[in-house]
Amino acid sequence: MRFHRLARAKLGHPPAAQDDTRGRRNRWSNVCYSAGMRWDQDHESSDVVDERGRSPQGAQLGGAGILGLLPLLLRFRFGWVIVVLVLGFGFLRNFMGGGATQRVADTAVTARGADVPAHFVAFVLDDTQATWTRIFADSGKTYRKAKLVLFSDSTQTACGAGDAATGPFYCPSDERVYIDLSFYQELANRFGAKGDFAEAYVVAHEIGHHVQKQLGITARVDHASRSQQQGAESSSVRLELQADCFAGIWARSTDQRKLLEAGDVDEALGAASAVGDDRLQRQATGKVNPETWTHGSAAERARWFKKGFDNGTIAACDTFAATSL
């Protein structure tokens, strides 16, 4: 698969008048209707860090591995190609040598973030973390909130240098989710996963990885042997499918609160399927090799999201105990 970069214009304020309903503000309130999910701009997370337009410090991959939505992509002379179908975990810690120095943002949210995509991400982050705060509290635990960093093209993390080509990802070392908003254009145009709830699924999946860290699941997988981190039944695949299931738990919560419209769940299922290992491999090479999977097939990713949506419990998302994925 050739994964070309999109032209990246800076996102700013939306035009005053729009012909479609995406991001349209209700004239009487701050509630927005985006041809799907109902969301409120008065309920946005303060844990969003806008680093778009900044030049990251150079660094090599180090620390705990990133956990992302897509297999790792690297650029060669003839375009973007999949060279390794794995993201993160211990054996990548010294892949390129050296450590990483985390760059701490000096502001929580910048004024430049006053655009519809950023507002929507901030709302979804707030809602997902409020949901997990309640779930943890119900079991006597305290949920520790993650930060979400908006960046352009590349960024520096405690896990090393991050790049937009890898798609959205979560860094366990700094407990931050990283998103280049242009990925949503790729998700819609290249992968065919359109709609605002497809975009919301991306955030919910990455927050699912943050939940895994707090439950101690990430550490157990990180210590798994190298041979257990690739393949259709691997710990890597089970970790990713569980994050999909956790995203489904959040989706169930939004449905119970009447935030969803008809077709929203289908959008999320479509997004989960679009980034299945089998589908990406087939696009890249015309062949499917389950032995190199790290995220699960399209059908598995959709199935586990739906399982979380249908059951709404952490116990239902135990992919590690499942005999069949």
Describe each region flagged by the PLM:
Residues 183-201, 231-235:
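Short pre-active-site segment immediately N-terminal to the catalytic Zn-binding motif
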Residues 38-40, 83, 90-160:
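A metal-dependent hydrolase signature that marks the N-terminal structural subdomain at the beginning
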Residues 207-222, 252-255:
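Catalytic Zn2+-binding segment of zinc metalloproteases
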Residues 153-180:
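Catalytic zinc-binding patch centered on the HExxH motif and its immediate surroundings
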Residues 115-143, 233-234, 238-281:
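Short helix/loop segments within enzyme catalytic domains
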Residues 132, 198-214, 244, 248:
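Active-site recognition of the HExxH zinc-binding catalytic motif
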Residues 32-109:
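Long amphipathic alpha-helical segments used for membrane anchoring, targeting, substrate engagement
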Residues 275-325:
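Pan-zinc metallopeptidase signature
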